[in-house]
Amino acid sequence: MYMADQFTAALDDVEESHARYAEQLGFVEGRTPFAAESLPDTRIAVRVNDDLLQEVASHILTRAGHVSVIDKRGAGKTHFRELVYDALSEGPRSDEFAIARIREVESITTRRLYTRLLDELSQYDALDVPETYPRATDEVRQVVEGVSEQLEEADLTCIVQVDQLEDAARNTRTFEQLLAGLQSIGDLGETGPAFILFLFGTPEAADRIDELRQTLSSRLVAKNRSLERFGFAETEELIARWLAWARDEEYEEGYLSDPYTAPAIRTIVERSDGTPRSVRQQCYHAYRAGARQFADDEGIEISDETIETYA
C-alpha cells in the first residue's frame, strides 16, 4: 500500500478540510475567500477614502496642482489608483480627461519617461502624437511640450499616474532622472498645469523626493496624503463582501458576516495593522482556523477562541 509523504498528506488533509468547510458555508467550488492578493471582483472592495477622493477630484477639476499619495505597503494605494484610473479612462466623464499610467520605474530614464507618456497619449484621437521619437532627450521633451499645447487646445487635462516610486528611489541616479522628468512635465501649461502628476509611493520615496528635488515637492498641492485604516466596521464589511463573492451572491448592506463572530472580528482588527492587505490576511488565517476547527468536529462558527486555538 502506498504511503504518502508528510507534505502530500498535509496537502490532502487541508484540501479535504477546506472543501468540507466551504461546502458547509455554501461556497462555489473553487472560490476561497481572502486568499487572493488582488481582488478577484471589484465588488469586494470596501468603500473608504471618500474624503481623499473628494480632495483629488477638486484638484483635478480646478487644475490646482499635483498630488502624492504616500503610505506603507499594503495600505490600498493600488486600489485607490485603479479606482481613479478606471473612472477617468472609462467612466461617464472620461471624455473630459486624458490619463497616462507610468509603471515599472525601477530603471527609468528621463527620456523613457517622456516616451512612455507619449505612448500612453497616442490612444487619444484629439492628440497628434508622432509614431517615432527623436533620440535626444531634449528633443523628446519638445514633443511632449507640443502635446501639452494640444491638450490645452482640446480643453483636456492629462493625469499622469506614477506608481511605486520607491522602486526608483533605491537608485539615486535613476530617481533623479525620474524626478527631473516629472518636474519638467508638471511645469508645462500656459493657464495651469497641462499635466497633473498623481504620484504613489512609500514614506521612503517621499523622503527622497524632499531630499533630491525640493522644487517638485513644493509643487504638490496635496502632499503625502495617506489612506484610511480599517476598523471593526470596515473589517466586518470586508468579510461580508468576500463571503458574498464566495457564494456568488450579490453583496448588499446588512449581508451577514457569519460564521465570523463579533469577538473574532475584533481579534482580526487587533492582530492586523489596519491596512487592507493585513486585514485580509488575518481574515484568511481566521478562515483557515475555522476549517481546522470544523475538521475536528468543534463547530462551524469562527470565534476569538477559534483564532487563538487554530490560527
Task: Kindly give the residue locations of the regions a language model identified.
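Conserved catalytic segments around the Walker B and adjacent sensor/switch elements
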Residues: 90-107
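The catalytic "switch" region of P-loop NTPases
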Residues: 156-158, 167-172, 176-264
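Walker A/P-loop nucleotide-binding motif
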Residues: 63-83
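Conserved NTP-binding/hydrolysis module of P-loop NTPases
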Residues: 107-131
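Walker B catalytic acidic pair
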Residues: 163-165
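Central P-loop NTPase core of STAND/AAA+ ATPases
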Residues: 122-151
